[in-house]
Amino acid sequence: MTKQNAFTREDLLRCSRGELFGPGNAQLPAPNMLMVDRITHISEEGGKFGKGELVAELDINPDLWFFACHFEGDPVMPGCLGLDAMWQLVGFFLGWQGLPGRGRALGSGEVKFFGQVLPSAKKVTYNIHIKRVLKGKLNMAIADGSVSVDGREIYTAEGLRVGVFTSTDNF
């Protein structure tokens, strides 16, 4: 059976409700924290490390919630939302791989911001390159990622770590 390799906004909303990978498994956050409109490509192969990759997009418009409050008179998408989107996508990759449990961001290595997303932008693109997937007592993915706006790279993150846990009671 061939795995689905692209996901629409409706697919991602289903994932936020726990309907895509099953109850108790990886979910994306619901809007407003869902920072992705579509996944245009997901694969277990390819990427910079040959272990998998994701490409996803967010459509930008001036009415997005964060522009009204960050910052008044100087609207810009918070950089932490781009970082969170990359964690969301690494967690999605684990669910797509069929690994059980709820996703939790576990950290990252170096993060760099060298650009910004303004209300005049059209599209943010996320590129995730899977470095390693651990399967066993701990199910976790490690990835590098980047965020581009209208084709220009503006953030990078190395060593993004996300795990999936069948119980988060002691987390």
Curated annotation (Swiss-Prot):
GO biological process: unsaturated fatty acid biosynthetic process
UniProt pathway: Lipid metabolism; fatty acid biosynthesis
A GO MF label: trans-2-decenoyl-acyl-carrier-protein isomerase activity
Listed InterPro entries: FabA, FabA_FabZ, HotDog_dom_sf
Any one GO cellular component localisation term in the record: cytoplasm
Compartments reported by the entry: Cytoplasm
Location of the active site: 70
Keyword Kinase among record annotations: no
SUPFAM superfamilies xrefs: Thioesterase/thiol ester dehydrase-isomerase
Catalysed conversion reaction: a (3R)-hydroxyacyl-[ACP] = a (2E)-enoyl-[ACP] + H2O; (3R)-hydroxydecanoyl-[ACP] = (2E)-decenoyl-[ACP] + H2O; (2E)-decenoyl-[ACP] = (3Z)-decenoyl-[ACP]
UniProt superkingdom: Bacteria
A Pfam family annotated for this UniProt entry: FabA
Principal location listed in the UniProt entry: cytoplasm
Keywords: Cytoplasm, Fatty acid biosynthesis, Fatty acid metabolism, Isomerase, Lipid biosynthesis, Lipid metabolism, Lyase
UniProt EC number: 4.2.1.59, 5.3.3.14
Assembly and interaction partners: Homodimer.
NCBIfam families tied to this protein: fabA, PRK05174.1
Physiological role: Necessary for the introduction of cis unsaturation into fatty acids. Catalyzes the dehydration of (3R)-3-hydroxydecanoyl-ACP to E-(2)-decenoyl-ACP and then its isomerization to Z-(3)-decenoyl-ACP. Can catalyze the dehydratase reaction for beta-hydroxyacyl-ACPs with saturated chain lengths up to 16:0, being most active on intermediate chain length.
Family: Belongs to the thioester dehydratase family. FabA subfamily.
Record-given protein name: 3-hydroxydecanoyl-[acyl-carrier-protein] dehydratase
Species, as recorded: Pseudomonas entomophila (strain L48)
Taxonomic placement: Bacteria, Pseudomonadati, Pseudomonadota, Gammaproteobacteria, Pseudomonadales
Chain's gene name: fabA
